[in-house]
Amino acid sequence: MTNFVFIVADDLGYADLGCYGGREPISPVLDKLAANGIKYINGYSNAPVCSPTRFALMTGRYQYWVRGASEEPMADNAIGNPELGLFPELPTLPSLLKDKGYHTALIGKWHLGYRPHFGPEKSGYMHHFGPMSGAVGYYSHTGTNKEHDLELD
């Protein structure tokens, strides 16, 4: 089986990386990875913030057809809300790959709904290392609710 890795970054512009025309040598490892692999040059995000984009990438659906894509990142009541997140019954890229025998892992923030109703393992990931929320202190690992938010399974 072919291995592949999706690298998704928040707030990254088209020409921020050297492999896409950036002038500053800030991404030599990613540039080398792109030079020795497949580099896509025609992909766009149709949302200005991160969570709706991840909803779309994970499901292959227009993100605003999936309840929670526009509400979850902004809602004060998102934590523990059973209606704001990526519903486990929706097929996702990781769940389809897992069904085909791939090992799946998410390294980084989930920010697609909170436990116990949602989570990476409910959407096809076998392993997760990172926060559930979208804003976590770099050193404290606490979320906006001031609780510890860093998982390793």
What are these model-derived regions, one by one?
Residues 1-153:
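Formylglycine-dependent sulfatase
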